[in-house]
């Protein structure tokens, strides 16, 4: 399964009052509005962050990027190729990682880049010590991998303001 990446904004042209070194007047300018489309990854992020900011206006929201991913075979109806392959809608995992980083910039949120700072990559055979089972599940971290993720998260969180 895959979800299209989508767009962050739609653009429209609108009239807006503006002045800079001249008399104020109405001008036509482009205006962007966040896309709230549950059928796209960026739309879902916009929806989720908007809702969290409404429900928890005084809380720090932190985004995490997805981990690297490798082959997983969970049966006849659930086989997931590694990250060298596009998903069913033609996207590589890198596009989803990049979208989370962009969301941090757009929404003013810190991003903890699990894709890089954990140092875990199941595409490298020697790193499979951090993943569940090299035979059929190179996607989910095992206990050792979860401990590494927890330490990464702890130290990254300590670097953020309260």
Description of each model-found segment:
Residues 1-161:
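Alpha-helical cap/lid subdomain in secreted, periplasmic
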């Amino acid at each position: 399964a895959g979800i299209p990446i989508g767009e962050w904004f739609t653009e429209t042209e609108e009239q807006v009052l503006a002045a800079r070194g001249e008399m104020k007047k109405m001008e036509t300018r482009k205006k962007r509005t966040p896309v709230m489309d549950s059928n796209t990854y960026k739309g879902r992020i916009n929806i989720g962050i908007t809702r969290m900011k409404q429900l928890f206006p005084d809380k720090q929201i932190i985004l995490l990027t997805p981990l690297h991913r490798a082959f997983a075979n969970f049966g006849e109806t659930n086989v997931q190729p590694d990250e060298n392959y596009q998903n069913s809608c033609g996207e590589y995992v890198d596009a989803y990682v990049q979208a989370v980083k962009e969301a941090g910039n757009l929404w003013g949120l810190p991003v903890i880049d699990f894709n890089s700072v954990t140092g875990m990559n199941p595409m490298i055979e020697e790193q499979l010590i951090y993943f569940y089972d090299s035979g059929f599940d190179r996607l989910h971290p095992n206990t050792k991998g979860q401990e590494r993720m927890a330490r990464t998260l702890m130290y990254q969180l300590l670097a953020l303001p309260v």
